[in-house]
């Protein structure tokens, strides 16, 4: 029972065990109670002025005669729209593991090759530090809300995910995972959002040449994925495949004889093995009839470590992404600041279909010169809004902090910029309420 207008005082005076139990059941920290807020209309106006106001899904899927959807060759660097998307979501792949970002160890020869032949995103930032945060961002295109990822929360079914948006437009959404999908509620989340779900329990035993407690070897995951993609392609459906790898994770073991680092090879060995497996997958895919019509997206779920001297060390969220489609895409680098939540609307934009305006994220190919380049980074409690050289952090007890971010990622306390403060609040407050009020539901 509340006795004060001060939420923090009420929490201190309450029954700690009961409060903790309730928080566990809800899997959330109530943004409206614990974080700085704005009037809802002011928050909506800020997002509208930033060009980031979400449309309802009905509006987003409704053709606009004044602004018809379709593949726009004038702003999208592909020769034509792909028919299929295969997204490889790589476990714990920090940008600084890649030679493309200056690593001298030679751990990622194949990824560096694809980066050279594809479109490399050099300033992409993950929203969090766990796989479920990455899946949330890449699938829902929403800023992280305090507490647990939406993937692990109750009432997370029938949301307007990337798959839900594409299914009625002729796509077969599929989620593949090399581990046990009940972990972190992955199976329930994707099944509840119209994805065909396939995890390690669905693969024939004879097809698994190596496995550990965390998952099957990535190469064997990809072998099984290829068979499923072939069958889906034969059915005549367009494909959206989201593949979550596992090998770049403790215990860092993998099949021997693939790379020059024997198993268990620690982090370096796991990164190099994952690189090998991805390279082999794409080599095999080149022989498939659907390859030339497919956009491959290689992106990390999060970094291997987000440790640092500050609460939200910006370099600990820097991840790589490569778009690869040798018959469709001109090689290059995209050097602007991008958030993980921008990937889903970008893919819808590239496919030339309806629905990208429903996401909080914005297609990178629609972000004009005046667009506020920003990224969202978080841990369980702190919510960061990063804009090139400044990080605004929202925390419990309505706390707001600002840091100047140097080129090497060093954070120095700075005076609060009211405009950026309000932008941060507008995004996080609106995202929290959208989920809580069922506004992210597909049929809302």
Give the ranges of each region predicted by the language model:
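N-terminal secretory/membrane-targeting segments
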Residues: 1-83, 115
């Amino acid at each position: 029972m509340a006795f004060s207008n001060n939420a923090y005082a009420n929490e201190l005076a309450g029954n700690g065990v009961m409060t903790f139990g309730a928080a566990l059941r809800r899997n959330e920290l109530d943004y409206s109670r614990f974080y700085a807020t704005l009037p809802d209309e002011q928050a909506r106006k800020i997002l509208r002025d930033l060009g980031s106001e979400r449309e309802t899904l009905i509006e987003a899927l409704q053709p606009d005669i004044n602004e018809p959807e379709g593949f726009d060759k004038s702003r999208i660097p592909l020769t034509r729209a792909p028919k299929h998307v295969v997204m490889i979501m790589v476990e714990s792949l920090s940008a600084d593991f890649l030679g493309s970002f200056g690593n001298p160890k030679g751990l990622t020869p194949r990824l560096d090759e694809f980066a050279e032949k594809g479109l490399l995103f050099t300033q992409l930032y993950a929203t969090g530090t766990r796989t479920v945060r990455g899946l949330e961002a890449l699938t829902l295109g929403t800023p992280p809300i305090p507490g647990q990822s939406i993937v692990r929360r109750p009432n997370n079914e029938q949301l307007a995910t990337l798959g839900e948006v594409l299914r009625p437009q002729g796509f077969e959404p599929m989620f593949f995972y090399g581990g046990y999908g009940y972990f972190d509620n992955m199976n329930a989340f994707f099944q509840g959002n119209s994805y065909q779900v396939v995890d390690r329990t669905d693969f024939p035993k004879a097809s698994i040449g190596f496995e550990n407690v965390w998952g099957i070897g990535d190469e064997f995951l990809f072998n099984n994925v290829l068979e499923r993609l072939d069958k889906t392609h034969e059915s005549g459906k367009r494909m959206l495949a989201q593949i979550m790898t596992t090998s770049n994770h403790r215990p860092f073991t993998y099949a021997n004889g693939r790379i020059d680092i024997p198993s268990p090879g620690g982090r370096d060995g796991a990164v190099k093995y994952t690189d090998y497996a991805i390279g082999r997958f794409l080599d095999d895919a080149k022989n498939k009839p659907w390859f030339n019509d497919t956009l491959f997206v290689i992106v990390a779920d999060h970094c291997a470590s987000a440790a640092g001297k500050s609460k939200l060390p910006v370099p600990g969220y820097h991840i790589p992404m490569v778009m690869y489609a040798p018959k469709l895409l001109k090689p290059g680098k995209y050097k602007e600041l991008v958030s993980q939540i921008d990937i889903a609307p970008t893919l819808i934009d590239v496919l030339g279909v309806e629905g990208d305006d429903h996401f909080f994220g914005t297609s990178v190919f629609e972000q004009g010169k005046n667009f506020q380049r920003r990224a969202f980074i978080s841990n369980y409690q702190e919510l960061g809004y990063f804009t090139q050289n400044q990080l605004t952090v929202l925390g419990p007890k309505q706390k707001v902090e600002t840091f100047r971010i140097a080129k090497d990622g060093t954070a120095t306390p700075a005076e609060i910029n009211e405009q950026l403060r309000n932008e941060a609040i507008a995004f996080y407050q609106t995202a929290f309420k959208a989920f809580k009020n069922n506004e992210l539901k597909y049929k809302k």
